[in-house]
Amino acid sequence: MSASTSRTLPPEIAESVSVMALIERGKAEGQIAGDDVRRAFEADQIPATQWKNVLRSLNQILEEEGVTLMVSAAEPKRTRKSVAAKSPAKRTATKAVAAKPVTSRKATAPAAPAAPATEPAAVEEEAPAKKAAAKKTTAKKATAKKTTAKKAAAKKTTAKKEDGELLEDEATEEPKAATEEPEGTENAGFVLSDEDEDDAPAQQVAAAGATADPVKDYLKQIGKVPLLNAEQEVELAKRIEAGLFAEDKLANSDKLAPKLKRELEIIAEDGRRAKNHLLEANLRLVVSLAKRYTGRGMLFLDLIQEGNLGLIRAVEKFDYTKGYKFSTYATWWIRQAITRAMADQARTIRIPVHMVEVINKLARVQRQMLQDLGREPTPEELAKELDMTPEKVIEVQKYGREPISLHTPLGEDGDSEFGDLIEDSEAVVPADAVSFTLLQEQLHSVLDTLSEREAGVVSMRFGLTDGQPKTLDEIGKVYGVTRERIRQIESKTMSKLRHPSRSQVLRDYLD
């Protein structure tokens, strides 16, 4: 019948005119609907008992021809109004996950530095030299003095450029013309931008000398504090100890002489200054230790911040009488603070700190055995080395796995994602969905041959309408009879349904 079909078709397909026409239309359009399949079966007068087999053969042919079988969204029509049809029918379509709208933030453009409100000739010489700035303030008195101050500032700018002492982040763009305003105002250290976007703050303040890299700015700031030698560390530690003693005296003593109280307050304040000095002089030690833990789930600045907390603890606990350098003592506190923070914050799924230590120990032993044996050690070998059971080793290895994002790009171009390769276990196969729709229609046609009460009892007992089976007591309350009477009706109805005249239509759907 179909000249385009080279393979031998099953007789139930080849003898059906409407089904063959449906296949040809599917080849042309690339897809067919489930309702069209049902209408084709009815047009060719295919017995309902053969629908399952014919659908199976049809689905195989469509897969070979590359035709998609679409599931109809419409629910089957019901010819009888059932008593149990109070709750909505069970939906068979898959759940559609609503995509959350992603709002893109406008990237606020950095404020362009506005020209300071001074004469253009004196702008370039204002930043480098403090003495030139002082001369500029005196230059307001007379025009001749102003000219002299400009020349002196220009000479100092040239000298500092030759010595290489200019700031790295000096603006290279030509300053824009601006209206004159008196120097030395409150906004002298800020650059205000008037070209703000609607969603940006009304004013944008840019710190002088700041860059777009916060790590670089931080390293630049802590690099200004000179390092300490051993004698200076001991001296600062003594001042810190005296300050802590003075704070304790002030807190626990109710009645102190005014003179003694003032002296204790001075000593306590001096101890706080010494503590800050010791902290600031050792911030570079934290950076050097934090570099060893980069790439393990935390940002570099976060590692530095956690290490600074450990440094504060080390300053408070340092005992200069032991004779050790402060850096030797502080290293352990900094390292502990960083590792504890990584164990608590680095993972997407938090793992307790004690379990993280077990995971790290297992990883170290596994690397060592890999070098010794030249192969991956078995769980039994690891268990013997770690003094634990093989089951426990496998469990700890599972805890150490890192989750992978479904949006991880694959390939060199990154045109596909990892989630594209994961099978959706809840997805409904189109052929099964069409088969289920046909089963529902046949089931309702069989229930139509029963009385209204019998059909209602069976529907509620097996949850044919809402997917929630009901007990005999619940059905009895609906019909106002006892649970025993409902059991009798159910038994009688099931006997009727087992008769070949009714069961033969549904039996083909069991496999």
From Swiss-Prot:
Keywords assigned by UniProt, alphabetized: DNA-binding, Sigma factor, Transcription, Transcription regulation
UniProt-annotated stretches for the region Sigma-70 factor domain-4: 446-499
Classification via InterPro entries: RNA_pol_sigma-70_dom (IPR014284), RNA_pol_sigma70 (IPR000943), RNA_pol_sigma70_r1_2 (IPR009042), RNA_pol_sigma70_r2 (IPR007627), RNA_pol_sigma70_r3 (IPR007624), RNA_pol_sigma70_r4 (IPR007630), RNA_pol_sigma_r2 (IPR013325), RNA_pol_sigma_r3/r4-like (IPR013324)
Chain intervals for the UniProt region annotation (Sigma-70 factor domain-2): 278-348
Basic residues compositional bias, start-end: 78-93, 132-158
Stretch list, region Sigma-70 factor domain-3: 357-433
SUPFAM superfamilies: Sigma2 domain of RNA polymerase sigma factors (SSF88946), Sigma3 and sigma4 domains of RNA polymerase sigma factors (SSF88659)
Region span, Binds RNA polymerase-binding protein RbpA: 211-347
PANTHER family membership: RNA POLYMERASE PRINCIPAL SIGMA FACTOR HRDA (PTHR30603:SF59), RNA POLYMERASE SIGMA FACTOR RPO (PTHR30603)
Protein name in the entry: RNA polymerase principal sigma factor HrdB
